[in-house]
Amino acid sequence: VNFSKAYFGKGDADFQFVDFGNGNVTFEESKFHFGNVIFVNCTFGNGTTNFKKVTFNDGKVDFHFSQFGEGHKIFDQTVFGGGEVDFKRCDFGAGKTDFRRIHFGDGNVTFEESIFTSGKISFKSSDFGHGEVNFHMVNFGADSAIFDNAKFWTGNVSFYHSISSQLSFIECELETFVDLRVDKCGYLDLTDCINRDIIEL
């Protein structure tokens, strides 16, 4: 399925309940303008799912309840507008997941209760903007969750009751309250992290 470099104009882009089946799915370098983008309850089968360098507008971007099969999930260098970004209760399956170098805008960002079965998870060098950031009860699976060099601004950040083998915040900028009262974390790395508020452990 190939929507690379597609342009979605005025109105909502609604993919709710779509089953993309097995095989690669790409929206690389697509642009969404003037409406909400809805991938609620979608199924992405085994294969690469690619949203690299996608530009979203100021509407809500909603992936909640979606399922991803085995394979690489790529959201590298994606730009979100000012609306809410919702990955609540997603199942990211097995395989590497890249959210690197993303600009999340100033809307709230949630991955609450999502599951990553296995594979490295990277939010390295991403900018989370000024909205609230919620990783409450996320299960990061058997591999590392990397937030190195990410920027968290004025919105509160929560990893409350999350489970991970490793959480890395090397050289992060934490300008806000961060809740790290996790359920389980094998290794927590805050090396050279700049913290200007409270980190609750």
Which residue ranges define each predicted feature?
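N-terminal leader/targeting and pre-domain segments
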Residues: 1-201
